[in-house]
Regions:
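Conserved beta-strand signature within the Rossmann-like core of class I S-adenosyl-L-methionine
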Residues: 334-336, 405-411
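Conserved helix-to-beta-strand junction in the class I
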Residues: 393-403, 434
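SAM-dependent methyltransferase catalytic-core segment centered on the flexible catalytic loop
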Residues: 311-396
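Core SAM-dependent methyltransferase catalytic element
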Residues: 402, 456-478
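Conserved phosphoryl-transfer catalytic core
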Residues: 134-198, 322-351
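Conserved proline-anchored active-site loop of SAM-dependent methyltransferases
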Residues: 105-122, 126-133, 139, 211, ...
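S-adenosyl-L-methionine
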Residues: 3-4, 8-99
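SAM-dependent nucleic-acid methyltransferase catalytic core
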Residues: 189-306, 311-318
Length: 478
């Protein structure tokens, strides 16, 4: 394979077979690194150095989204738009040549459990962690196999709950979380609290949490809100259906998924390892911080398939505030504690307690943004905090990975005030420092910019990629 860079036009061509193919988009365009005439040398060096590692596979564009999970049994139990598809996990496990008898799968940003659930369905032992309480709850319920339920008892409890006459509940929602009060009609909120109280009376934990997940999953549907990018938007024109009707549909769908023969066959119990194998067949998701988890777990990883929060200002404590307030927080101060515990990809990030990342390209970006009229002055704090946090994560992953382990990380680049941030390449450099080797960077799609940025700085598509690393063998580790 031959690469040619035209110094006059900065157009990049790749020779494959007997012809050249334009791959200008892959390298993000040198001139686009800064729209405010700031320094770009650090990012140009990164792009040029990693150019041979790019593998453009735009056919995967939908697999890095949650869209396919919306119709997949069990995966569809909770709407989690920030995840990737079950098909991506299947594809990567096949491409990596993994063996259930010898390899253990891990996801440090497990979200609603797509990676461990697919791994379990394919016969692997797997585990995951996440810091967002509602995500951990959803993942734990989805990971329960059929053996956790008496289907006749579950069917009976579903019917009993849905046919129970309404009565006022003794429970209340957080009074100082404004979005909860704005999101619901009083009658709707009363219905939600009624069903929550009745579900809490059920002794069987698996059934109780199954029903509670059903209720949690419909909170947006029966509200005046809509998850819209980084916000939970109010939509007063939205027609609100009856809570009982929506809950009925949700629980029937979940029950049919659990009871179907196809799903039964794809949810094995513990993995049976072949003779001489050493796989750990446990499958679980726990609440933990990816920046500091290793010492709390006696576990390991041969393959990591994950996606950290993107550097896109999304605040998961806002996006999922209704779900958090249903069962995980009782007041606004508790919601704030959740917010400030998250990886710093959002605008309310606090100043970094560490100062370990001094990458030239990152310093270049921060220097260019200094003194600019930003639409939010905390953007540089967020950018700095994001890479400080991810540096901590990568060092934790290096400790949990066995030598030769593969890591697939789905990430997206960002652009703030016309400054392009090559997240995939910056993280790859940090990963190398942590003890990994870069294998390839699979470009899956190109994302647009906000209308505000396009109006001021023009349109520049940014990469969404799967960066693939390998843990260096023991002989290469310092």
């Amino acid at each position: 394979m031959t690469w040619i860079v035209s110094k006059l036009s900065r157009v990049i061509w790749r020779r494959k077979g007997g012809c050249f193919r334009l791959v200008e988009r892959v390298i993000q365009g040198f001139a686009a690194q800064s729209a405010i005439r700031g320094a770009t040398e650090g990012r140009e060096e990164l792009e040029a150095r990693y150019l041979p590692y790019f593998d453009e596979r735009l056919r995967l564009r939908q697999l890095v989204t949650y869209v396919p999970n919306k119709v997949a049994p069990i995966h569809r139990w909770f709407p989690y738009k920030e995840g990737f598809s079950y098909q991506l996990v299947e594809m990567l496990l096949r491409e990596f040549g993994t063996d259930p008898a010898h390899h253990r799968i891990f996801d440090p940003f497990a979200g609603c459990g797509t990676t461990p659930l697919v791994a379990r369905q394919m016969g692997f032992g797997a585990w995951g962690i996440d810091i967002l309480p509602v995500a951990v709850f959803v993942a734990q319920v989805k990971l329960r196999g059929l053996e956790a339920y008496n289907l006749a008892h579950l069917r009976s409890e579903i019917d009993r709950l849905l046919n129970m006459p309404f009565h006022p509940s003794s429970l209340s929602a957080p009074q100082d979380v404004r979005i909860v009060q704005l999101a619901y009609e009083p009658e709707t909120l009363e219905q939600i609290l009624f069903f929550k109280e009745e579900i809490r009376r059920i002794d069987n934990k698996a059934i109780r949490e199954f029903l509670l997940l059903g209720l949690t999953s419909i909170l947006e549907d029966v509200s005046y809100t809509s998850k819209d990018g980084q916000y939970l938007r109010l939509r007063r024109d939205k027609k609100i259906p009856a809570v009982r009707d929506v809950l009925h549909s949700q629980l029937e769908m979940m029950y049919s998924d659990l009871a179907s023969k196809q799903v039964q066959l794809s949810l094995p119990g513990l993995v049976e390892t072949s003779s001489g194998g050493h796989s750990d067949g446990r499958c679980y998701v726990a609440q933990a911080d990816a920046r500091s988890f290793v010492d709390s777990f006696d576990d390991y990883a041969d393959v990591i398939i994950t996606s950290p929060p993107y550097l896109n200002r999304y605040d998961y404590s806002r996006i999922y505030s209704l779900e958090l307030c249903l069962q995980f927080v009782n007041e606004f101060e508790e919601l704030k504690r959740v917010r400030h515990s998250l990886l710093r990809s959002h605008i309310e990030s606090r100043e970094s307690p560490t100062d370990d990342v001094h990458h030239p390209a990152l310093l270049e970006i921060l220097d260019n943004l200094a003194g600019q009229d930003l639409n939010n002055p905390r953007i540089p704090v967020m950018i700095k905090g994001y890479f400080e946090d991810m540096n901590l994560v990568l060092r934790q992953l290096a400790r949990v990975c066995r030598p030769g382990a593969r890591v697939a990380l789905v990430v997206a680049n960002a652009r703030f005030h016309g400054e392009l941030i090559p997240v995939d390449l910056l993280l790859s450099d940090l990963a190398v420092d942590a003890g990994f080797e870069v294998e390839c960077i699979i470009v899956t799609r190109y994302k647009g910019n906000s209308s505000q940025q396009m109006g001021r700085f023009g349109r520049v598509a940014v990469r969404e990629s799967i960066v693939v690393w390998r843990k260096a063998s023991a002989a290469h580790l310092s």
